[in-house]
């Protein structure tokens, strides 16, 4: 079993936690960096990919972005923005000497990849795996309200619409509607059979999520509300594997928009998967992940 190393990187006067699976070897295989979703979701679910370190003899790096998990802090709304999180990724690469790497990002992590490639133009990135991310907050909002919400019971649609109209995101009816929405399009298929790392209590970054994104998945009101990169996807020169689930918050239109816009990209639409394809379709996903990274090492 691969060696696990944990540590902290100083960042903006705070500490960013990281977890490394496996060791760097002179085998031509670049490490894989994992960018979690949220903002504020923690690295935990990426531990399902620990096996890739052994199966592919490759070092894997995951971390809790500032504001959540073992990097938790709150009371700092000035920190919850794209630049802080992208600078943190850049700092982590320098801190750990990850001059060459592959990067996988899920949900918000996929947004990070898109902005990182376009705005930072980083060197040494072998490939991207964009898992259920998106290039446009307005597209994500439209798909959430137009496509996903309209499959829900009318009383739940009414509760969501009332919250959006009034700005009051509280109450039993609203909470029940959001829970149903997330269960349909986000939560793991596996239920009680989910891996321990997916059920483990975690210190989510609630403040970073609300300040960065908004009160729920379909109402971006935070600092990322103007995240719009559709017209610039052609600037991404990094080979990109796009993955999404058939019942995903990342609708087929969102995923296809990325696949159409990013040169040298490939799209896999997973059946029996929601917003975390690498959990719901773990074994098949790992096969494709390993195949993709080896192609571009």
Task: Place the predicted regions along the sequence by residue.
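Conserved loop-alpha-helix segment in the C-terminal half of the alpha/beta-hydrolase fold
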Residues: 223-273
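Active-site loop/oxyanion-hole signature of alpha/beta-hydrolase fold enzymes
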Residues: 61-108
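Alpha/beta-hydrolase
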Residues: 148-151, 155-238, 257
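Active-site acidic short loop of glycosyltransferases
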Residues: 94-100, 122, 237-238, 264
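Conserved HGGG/HGGXW glycine-rich cap/lid loop of the alpha/beta-hydrolase fold
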Residues: 14-74, 78
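Catalytic active-site module of serine/aspartate enzymes centered on a nucleophile-bearing elbow/loop
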Residues: 264-297
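Conserved hydrolase catalytic core segment
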Residues: 99-143
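N-terminal cap/lid segment of alpha/beta-hydrolase-fold proteins
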Residues: 1-15
